[in-house]
Amino acid sequence: MWSGIPVFALLSSIGIAAAENGLDGWLRYASVPCNGNCQRALPSHIVTLNSTKSSQVYVAGQELQDGLHQILGKHASVKSTGCSTDSSIVVGTVEAYRQVCNTGSQAPELDVDGFWLSIRGKSVQIVGQTERGALYGAYEYLSMLAQGNFSQVSYATSPHAPIRWVNQWDNMDGSIERGYGGPSIFFKDGVIPQDLSRVKQYARLLASVRINGIVVNNVNANASLLMPSNMDGLARIADVFRPYGIRVGISLNFASPSTLGNLSTYDPFDSSVIAWWGNVTDQLYARIPDMAGYLVKANSEGQPGPTTYNRTLADGANMFARALKPHGGVVMFRAFVYDHHISEDNWYNDRANAAVDFFKPLDGKFDDNVVVQIKYGPIDFQVREPASPLFANLYKTNTAIELQVTQEYLGQQSHLVYLPPLWQTILRFDLRVDQKPSPVRDIISGQRFDRPLGGWAAVVNVGTNTTWLGSHLAMSNLYAYGRLAWEPTLDSEDIVQDWIRLTFGLDRRVLDTLTQMSMESWPAYENYSGNLGIQTLTDILYTHYGPNPASQDGNGWGQWTRADHLSIGMDRTVKNGTKFSGQYPAEVAAMYENIETTPDNLMLWFHHVNYTQRLHSGKTVIQHFYDAHYDGAETAQTFVSRWESLRERIDAERYQHVLARLIYQAGHSIVWRDAINNFYRNLSGIADEKERVGYHPWRVEAEDMQLDGYVPYAVSPFETASNFTAIVTASNGTTGTASATLDFKTGTYDLGINYYDMYGGKSHWTVYLNDRVVGQWQGNSEDVLSHTPSIYLDGHSATRITFRDVKIHKGDRLKIVGEPDGVEPAPLDYAVVLPRGIVD
């Protein structure tokens, strides 16, 4: 039970704290208003039933002492003897509590890592089935206090599943694949650095949401991690995590016996290979006795694996499992295995089929300490996918779900997208195995098929940025992941409200505003990126960030839309298509097989239809595209004003940081909207019924302006420029000027400039009206925003700056002067003159 309901009403306005950089995350423990009564009602002593400084119970005592002082100014002493319940917090394991406190009935039975929390006046008992559970209970108690909740409670809670891990895709050189929060906190220049202070801070955050394992390196692993010096470094990392109840694991490169061990083979049946892995594993456990185990990506996207030697994936997984077995370790074996060279010319080819095709025949052949780690959908972390059918096809195999906190396809932390509502569409989905209730959450816990292991993994990818993920608001997803991994039936809105109170305080307006924005953010992003199950429509061949729908097709990666001038969507039916729908149990298969019973939000995932196909909503497919993209972009515009309403209620540093990203998102959502709508308007030849697509009366196209030092440039992909054309300076040493006489009636407008901010240069622009400077800016988004930059004029680099409340007279002369820098030729797309209340 997590409780965030305060005893007293949330204040309507609370004084702003000093500037904060986000490093403390939701553990900032800001002072809670208190008239002194709550302090007097709190315990004065903390009794930790273990005095060993490396123990989680000892750490729990330190966390309680520090938290009480920060939240309420309460100075509580800590001791490790006795069991007085008079004005004391007693924290320890069930075993220690029963022995020291001489009680056998008060603490209930708990599952592994579960805890019991009892608050009765000044007497608080926090009792864990393990030391880890006791630490979790301490964080729970502090979370209540930090949210102004001084309720008396008594309850026990245990985890949904034993495996609650995070994955980091950190590389040995310090870079992070799909990381948007700065360089690695674990690696630099091929080694583990001496300063691991950020690792300790990360450990606190993870433990506070009950994460119990971490894989610290990229699944596309570098064998050099297994060198003795780096094993020593891993041991130092493990030493930092251990007091917080988090076990360290590593990703392995399957070919390491060859690339690092100088063997002629990495065949999992070869005795020398088996011995090599056994020796490596023994060396690791000699340094890290509680190592969690291994994560393996094999035979996928160019990674080596057992099929090279005609061995099965189970053969490969079991080789590692047997090396780990004596030490109690686990193999997390990724189900992300597919051929990325298949031909779209074959109507029946389908990447979505791959996981079941590879793994279903192996059900029951994996050792009992192997867990198959399955992405939530059949493709790759898309904005909406059906639940992977593999969850329903492994009766005799341990499974875990793989989620992604890092927003690889979902805005890369430069767009606000609160992910739990997306995750819940998968976790709650009932696969109806054998016509029995089979929600995904019950399969991964091991409950549905009576499996001993199972659980959760999330790709997180924090970095050295003080916001951890590159955005303050993105931290809600990491917090929520931990909460759901413990109890997946929790409500997404309740979770984000707890996070808001812990992160931004108890102000009611802040709570209500951020709750609404968060809950609207995923539907908005889905609307302006890709809808009806068509996938995210991002550029899958480059950054995975901005729009490029054509990149989905015509290649072997298998994220196809099969869009042509008449029709769109993948036919995944058994009757006419790839037979993917038949991978589901009968009841679900029947629903997806028939267009009449397929939900609109997955229509194009399962069916290839004409653009004029009517949806259940009554709209045609193409009109739904047009409307959804306008709706989503319009919602994103409102995020800015809603956040601005909180200006006096949030510290200036975090306020400005978030505001810059929301302003950017508002502009980039229009780039998305126009790119997707223009692409499909051009492809289908079908006009928007509401006459919005391609009609922009408030714009002044840059190529139509009077140019001096600027020249027109045909942008590719074409749809990422208004009217398909931008302007660039004639050379990288030439200043460009674009001028136009404005023919809008006199009034006050918002003046927007759409431009391209490319990697490799920091151009400078100045905007004039009749030689009066309206504003100026530099193209430095690579220093400000978190997303992967682009060296091209495209949907990744396209962005907008807006100058508000500009007084414009009809006939005024608009002039934009661009000064190129580096490889960036001060590119411009258009200017837009917007009356108040108009979304271009």
From Swiss-Prot:
It is an enzyme of class 3 (hydrolase). It comes from the Eukaryota. It catalyses: an alpha-D-glucuronoside + H2O = D-glucuronate + an alcohol. GO terms for molecular function: alpha-glucuronidase activity. Pfam families: Glyco_hydro_67C, Glyco_hydro_67M, Glyco_hydro_67N. Keywords: Carbohydrate metabolism, Glycoprotein, Glycosidase, Hydrolase, Polysaccharide degradation, Secreted, Signal, Xylan degradation. It is found in: Secreted. One of its GO terms (biological process) is xylan catabolic process. Its main location: secreted. InterPro entries: A-glucoronidase_C_sf (IPR037054), Glyco_hydro_67_aGlcAse (IPR011395), Glyco_hydro_67_aGlcAse_N (IPR005154), Glyco_hydro_67_C (IPR011099), Glyco_hydro_67_cat (IPR011100), Glycoside_hydrolase_SF (IPR017853), Hex-like_dom2 (IPR029018). GO terms for cellular component: extracellular region. Residues 1-19 form the signal peptide. Its EC number is 3.2.1.139. Glycans are attached at N50, N149, N222, N262, N279, N310, N465, N527, N576, N610, N682, N723, N732. Gene3D superfamilies: Alpha-glucuronidase, C-terminal domain, Chitobiase/beta-hexosaminidase domain 2-like, Glycosidases. PANTHER family: ALPHA-GLUCURONIDASE A. Alpha-glucuronidase involved in the hydrolysis of xylan, a major structural heterogeneous polysaccharide found in plant biomass representing the second most abundant polysaccharide in the biosphere, after cellulose. Releases 4-O-methylglucuronic acid from xylan. Belongs to the glycosyl hydrolase 67 family. This is Probable alpha-glucuronidase A.
